[in-house]
Amino acid sequence: MPRLMHGRIVTEEELKRAAGDVAEFSARSPARFAFTPPVDSHSFDYLFPSLQDDEANLLPEAANMPDLLKKLGASMAQADVPAGDSAIPAAYTYLGQFIDHDITLETGSGALTDLLDPGMTPLPVAEIRHVVRNLRTGALDLDSVYGPPAPRDGAKMLIGNVSSLGGTQPPIKRPPGKSDDNDLPREPRSADIEHDRAALTGDPRNDENLIISQLHVAFLKAHNALVGQGLSFGEASRVLRQHYQHIVVHDFLKRIAEPAIVDDIVTSGNHWFDPAAYPFRMPLEFSFAGYRLGHTMVRAAYNFNLNFNLHGGIPATLELLFTFTALSGDLNDFDTIPDNWIIEWENVIGTGPNVSHARKLDTNIASVNDKALYNLHTLTGATEAPVDAARLPVRNLLRGYRLRLPTGQAVAHLLGVPVLSKDEILAAVNSPAQAAALQAGGFESRTPLWFYVLAEANHFHQGERLGPVGSTLVAEVLIGLVRRSEDSILRLPAWKPYLPSAKAGTFELADLLRFAGVLGSGQPPRTYTVKKGDTLTAIARSQLGDGNRWPEIYLMNRGTIRNPNQIFPGQVLLLPPAQPTGPIPKLYTVKKGDTLSGIAKAKLGNANRWPEIFALNRDVITNPDRIITGQILVLPN
């Protein structure tokens, strides 16, 4: 698929052309390609449709509204001052972007010319529901990694090599310990700028800046590390997807949202977003407002590696990070990323003194001399024109108006959470110009939802995390998307992370980077190859020190072991941590005539507890009224 620059909306015609390009490239390429089913587009719709019934819940439809929103967006520019940083390591900004690219690729909301038209008005609700489409699966399934045209090398994913500069001193020195395989696989040179050295990934946007590009490489390496331990392609992709889902819920969300809201949705279920609804629709309020929090987290410059940093090196500005991965003409004769641009992850994740942090979640967007997210580029490297086209905050505000997003106050009132007053909105901004732009548009009382989410984060948490509206929007949808994923860990309540981690019982982004071998010294997963005469009990005794822990091995490998009494020489089994992280699971073998309520009565003392058994076994039971003799079920502890 041709590359996409940040903030650009893809058209249906481009998608049709891209599908043909992928087919043509696949036919002439010697590489195998990761197989994923074709993605059918689905609609966007409102998470809170009742708010569309009253115009008072929306921004006023007025002739000067686009101009007022442009002025508000322009007022959000702020110099990149480290004193304004959050406690969130900068890597999570780009994990958030990676997640976004995994779940949404929007078409139909309008080209820039439509958006910037001074006479632009909101689209009718029916047109929004019909025309605005999502081209991703809408699940946390890594289709941005595994989807076509991502090439495979057997069971492994193909990784590209960097271009060696041969330098021994900064700024052209390769970071120590970094190998050649640190770039995305790429198309060859082409006279067509949309394909010239474009990345072969499931989503071309994962090549729009160097940090997300290098994060994508880390996911490819993590997959290959699993295959290197003997797992098949399917097994490795399942393990990686499930640990990725754990990172999204228990690491990423716990950092950027209110943990109590996250925990409530995980344990009590979704209250507003129904991930099982058919037909499935992606919430507009999430995609075009709530989840655009990452734009305020972006820095204008980073500590990137020994060559490009804020401590005596050349600053790794956002301009350079976009240029040196988009390959838009400034790389002369290089076919791939120069090796002096390989990331050193310890600069953007961890607790060290030189770690770059995300900016605070507030109403300010990083800008240095009117650059960064106020200086978006075309594929040729030129600044978008007119000036408002280059300003990402302006685009966000105009698109929210065009798509009839409700105001932040209307959403807060519906959710039953504290509604920010006019004075609280004004107090959350950090410049007289921004306050003036708010008042000029009457936005302090009817605030654009995206702006409100950022102001609320500043008001309630001083920019360290989202407030109640933002937390609800983001956590409801991301947790719901985990629930609707094929390999969902939330449909397997007994599931726990089992890849090596710094803290037992959890798995964070840094653990994935270590496991991929791109941060510090990674550890391989614990695996065991079955030998003739082995049993799960014997394996548990020899590998875990306790034969009674065999159910842990069984549950970890239930996708490949149908019967725990039948394992075969050559099977590669994943092993849990040597130290137990919880009680040993209880199992039950279904007998003829059993029902879930009967099992609940016999084993739990209460027939009404059958839904608990069903919830624990959603990966093997699709209908609670149909269980099969010989099935092995997990019981609640």
Regions found by a protein language model. Give the residues of each.
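Primarily a LysM-type cell-wall glycan-binding module
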Residues: 523-547, 571, 579-607, 611-614, ...
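Short alpha-helix capping/helix-loop boundary micro-motifs
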Residues: 558-562, 618-622
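Terminal regions of secretory-pathway proteins
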Residues: 1-205, 209-210, 231-524
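Acidic helix/loop microenvironments that form the catalytic cleft of cell-wall polysaccharide enzymes
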Residues: 240, 244, 557, 617
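Mobile, glycine-rich extracellular loop/lid and propeptide segments
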Residues: 209-226, 239-240
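Generic detector of short, aliphatic-rich beta-strand segments that form the cores of beta-sheets
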Residues: 567-576, 627-635
